[in-house]
Amino acid sequence: MTNQEYMLRAIQLAKKGEGWTNPNPMVGAVIVKDGKIIGEGYHKKYGELHAERNAIASLTESAEGAVIYVTLEPCCHHGKTPPCTEAIIEQKIRKVVIGSRDPNPKVAGKGVQMLREAGVTVVEDFMREECDQLNPVFFHYITTKTPYVVMKYAMTLDGKIATKTGASKWITGESARKEVQHMRHQYMGIMAGIGTVLADDPMLNVRVEGWKSPVRIVCDSKLRIPPGSQIVKSAEKYRTIVAYADQKNTEEKIKILHTMGVETIYCPDEKNQIDLKKLMADLGNRGIDSILLEGGGTLNDSALRAGIVKEVQAFVAPKLFGGVAGKTPVEGIGVELPSEAVELKYTDICQIGEDIRIKCQVCDKKQEESCLQES
């Protein structure tokens, strides 16, 4: 096997932790000696051993003089688990090949420095682009302390998320809907607007055995959510947060919601609407590193205008609804000129069953130049 193949194996291992490591990154590690793999591992779950220590625990022989390929710079601080740099040095591993750099201020090059001071050879930025693709959520959250927001919607080929009557079940096929279940498992939170709750009475949970359900977040400015809704009734089983902005006649309603296990966040803007930037800061402080936005056109528009959306995933079905009254993914007043559009960069297009999934990165002002260069 080549160096690239060993790192690809580490990437493959890292992906096994998807949905379980948050707010930690996904990391994989492979230990090689005399041209063969003698140990491998990945970070399985938040709070448990890191990839390097799991790889060491799986060793079939001494790692003295071996090379370890790891997708992210090894940690060098005591957290929920001991430092991985110490374990690497103790095992007398001679060389560490690293993919991504760790922007965590507790690490950020300190792990590399510690290894080199101990006489270990370190190679940085090996297949960095491929390794970086594992952890956009972690990189965003650790540097901003706000959730990485993915706007997801299903639409017809003519851009409708519902018919003129509001009917939307089902636009996409079974395979695409199962992928959405996987996405809910992957991200820590799922967010919808009160309009979706009142219209569909959704659970917003994961219905696949063995996958975890996200924290459910409802944007409800005037606190209209019914205590009898499925989301409220199941709040003691699935963590649920309702954000609101208007305190008028809400005291009794808040008491009821709290009694039923619902958390509330008051975050108004100057117009008594929810300040989404403040909400993201609050959710980040509560340890929520990522959000799947399953809103309607109004909430999607507000989220884009607030600048909180980092990625868009659109599932496109081979259907046409037609009609000017059909609902669209992003509503509001729209832009006046094409030059005012939200710029996106395609990152992946694939077929899932009968439908197409399109992934795009949102190009904010800081990213605009690189997006234009790479598009």
PLM feature spans:
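A broad detector of short, well-ordered amphipathic alpha-helices
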Residues: L8, Q12-K15, G39, H50-R53, ...
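Short beta-strand scaffold segments in enzyme catalytic cores
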Residues: M26-G35, Y153-A154, I358
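A short, flexible N-terminal coil/short beta segment enriched in small residues
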Residues: A10-A14, A29, D34-G41, E130-T143, ...
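Enzymes that bind and transform nitrogen-containing heteroaromatic metabolites
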Residues: N3-G17, N22-N24, A63, K80, ...
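Short, conserved alpha-helical segments within structured domains
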Residues: P25-V27, M127-E130, G295
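Zn2+-dependent cytidine deaminase-like catalytic core
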Residues: I31-E130, V215, I241, D246-K248, ...
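Proteins enriched for Cys/Gly/acidic motifs involved in redox and nucleic-acid/cofactor modification
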Residues: G19-T21, V112, F126-A154
